[in-house]
């Protein structure tokens, strides 16, 4: 249905210089073992979001390689993130964010958030799903089965692919469709368009990321 058009942003995530302009909110730390971005927590319960500095338009395909290293924890992607009045996500008029989840789903920003590795709590590990939510608010928009194994059994990396075009959202892992959703623009508020993208983790999760890219989404 969609193919990749022009490349809007590409980052191999292989060295510290690749993320020198990225912004950390909360208690996260980065390292670059094996020429890949390793994200982990500074201390217990130190959840965080690591933001790409670019503001992306609507109509995009987002791809990245993901490898789970240690659980429990949770991995999420924020996208189409901006202030509730259209401000840039880093506008100084917005309240300071420190990695605490309510700041992101019930604060002064709008965003879509895709939880694609939910292993923080026992009930999440017992019945694994990928969840798509829309904020402001804590609106569960779509769910899909999570095919990713526990870190000990992982054959990493896994290729993650997210399509966002107006109200349409589609997510797949290694080419396997996981969930899709069409935002009607009224049930949970207006359709979100341009905004920033960030990786969120909940401690004590450790994970590895590589080859992050954003392309224009072109309808076939």
From Swiss-Prot:
Coiled coil: none
SUPFAM superfamilies associated with the record: Concanavalin A-like lectins/glucanases
Superkingdom of origin organism: Bacteria
Signal sequence region: none
Protein's recorded name: Uncharacterized protein YesU
Organism per entry: Bacillus subtilis (strain 168)
Gene: yesU
């Amino acid at each position: 249905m969609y193919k990749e058009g022009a490349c809007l942003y590409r980052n191999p995530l292989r060295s510290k210089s690749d993320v020198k302009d990225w912004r950390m909110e909360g208690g996260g730390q980065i390292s670059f073992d094996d020429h890949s971005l390793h994200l982990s927590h500074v201390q217990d319960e130190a959840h965080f979001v690591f933001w790409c500095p670019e503001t992306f338009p609507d109509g995009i395909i987002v791809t990245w390689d993901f490898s789970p290293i240690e659980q429990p924890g949770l991995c999420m992607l924020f996208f189409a993130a901006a202030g509730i009045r259209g401000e840039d996500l880093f506008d100084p008029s917005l309240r300071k964010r420190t990695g605490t989840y309510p700041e992101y789903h019930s604060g002064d920003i709008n965003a879509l958030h895709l939880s694609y590795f939910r292993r923080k709590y026992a009930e999440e590990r017992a019945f694994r799903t990928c969840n798509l939510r829309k904020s402001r608010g804590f609106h569960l928009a779509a769910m899909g089965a999570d095919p990713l194994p526990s870190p000990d059994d992982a054959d990493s990396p896994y290729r993650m692919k997210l399509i966002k075009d107006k109200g349409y959202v589609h997510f797949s892992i290694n080419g396997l469709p996981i969930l899709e959703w069409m935002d009607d623009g009224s049930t949970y508020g207006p359709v979100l368009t341009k905004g920033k993208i960030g990786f969120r983790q909940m401690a004590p999760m450790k994970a590895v990321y590589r080859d992050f890219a954003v392309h224009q989404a072109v309808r076939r």
